């Protein structure tokens, strides 16, 4: 299954949760989910009871769509999490958070992960001084992420920095917004990562 590219606000309404996919509209309080907090369609306001499998599938979809992964990418990441020692669900979330596109977003250089992914693929991002154009690149603790010199005055990036100043920066990165760079200082603890996902359902789904 390929990465979802359809209307993101309709998707958020269908899943009934904010997936942080509409940055500027969300920050302005204009997201469709806030105005119409129910599924689209004629019977959208009557949500059917969800089965156990439905709950498991729903959590996987939320994680995939929020972080912008295809089914193949997500399954590969889950296998990597399951291979490591520790809580598989928590490790999965940490691996998602270590993706380069996600950290560009977390550092406030993009209002959405989708825009962050575009910045990476179009060559606007450097890691330790070298251009990296792979959104799934797993950033290591201590690595420096910065906007390429030619892109530092990009209007969209400047707008993102201005808007994300309202929301603050997560505790596991250290950012110099004026200089357009940040350091991934440590792996986050699960209780620090504020996302509407119950990863235990994902573990149950893939463990069948």
UniProtKB/Swiss-Prot annotation:
Domain S4 RNA-binding: 98-161
Cellular component GO terms, alphabetical: small ribosomal subunit
Sequence intervals crossing the membrane: none
Record GO biological process: ribosomal small subunit biogenesis; translation
Keyword terms, alphabetized: Ribonucleoprotein, Ribosomal protein, RNA-binding, rRNA-binding
InterPro entries registered for this protein in UniProt: Ribosomal_uS4, Ribosomal_uS4_bac-type, Ribosomal_uS4_CS, Ribosomal_uS4_N, S4_RNA-bd, S4_RNA-bd_sf
SMART domains the record matches: Ribosomal_S4, S4
GO molecular function list: rRNA binding; structural constituent of ribosome
Function: One of the primary rRNA binding proteins, it binds directly to 16S rRNA where it nucleates assembly of the body of the 30S subunit. With S5 and S12 plays an important role in translational accuracy.
Record family assignment: Belongs to the universal ribosomal protein uS4 family.
Complex formation: Part of the 30S ribosomal subunit. Contacts protein S5. The interaction surface between S4 and S5 is involved in control of translational fidelity.
PANTHER family in the cross-refs: 30S 40S RIBOSOMAL PROTEIN, SMALL RIBOSOMAL SUBUNIT PROTEIN US4M
Name of the protein in its database record: Small ribosomal subunit protein uS4
Organism: Campylobacter hominis (strain ATCC BAA-381 / DSM 21671 / CCUG 45161 / LMG 19568 / NCTC 13146 / CH001A)
Gene name tied to this protein: rpsD
């Amino acid at each position: 299954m390929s990465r979802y590219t359809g209307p993101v606000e309709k998707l958020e309404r269908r899943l009934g949760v904010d997936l942080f996919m509409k940055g500027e509209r969300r920050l302005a309080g204009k997201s469709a989910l806030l105005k119409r907090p129910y599924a689209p369609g004629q019977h959208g306001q009557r949500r059917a009871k969800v089965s156990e499998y439905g709950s498991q599938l729903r959590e996987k979809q939320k994680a995939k769509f929020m972080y912008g992964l295809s089914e193949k990418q997500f399954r590969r990441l889950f296998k990597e999490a399951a291979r490591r020692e520790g809580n598989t669900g928590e490790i999965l979330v940490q691996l998602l958070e270590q993706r380069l596109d996600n950290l560009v977003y977390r550092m406030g250089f993009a209002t959405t992960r989708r825009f962050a992914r575009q910045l990476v693929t179009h060559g606007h991002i450097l890691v330790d001084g070298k251009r990296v154009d792979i959104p799934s690149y797993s950033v290591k603790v201590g690595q420096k992420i910065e906007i390429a010199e030619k892109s530092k005055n990009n209007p969209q990036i400047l707008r993102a920095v201005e808007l994300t100043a309202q929301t603050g920066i997560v505790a596991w990165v250290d950012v110099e917004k004026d200089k357009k760079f940040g350091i991934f200082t440590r792996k986050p603890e699960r209780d620090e990562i504020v996302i509407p996902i119950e990863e235990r359902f994902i573990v149950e789904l893939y463990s069948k």
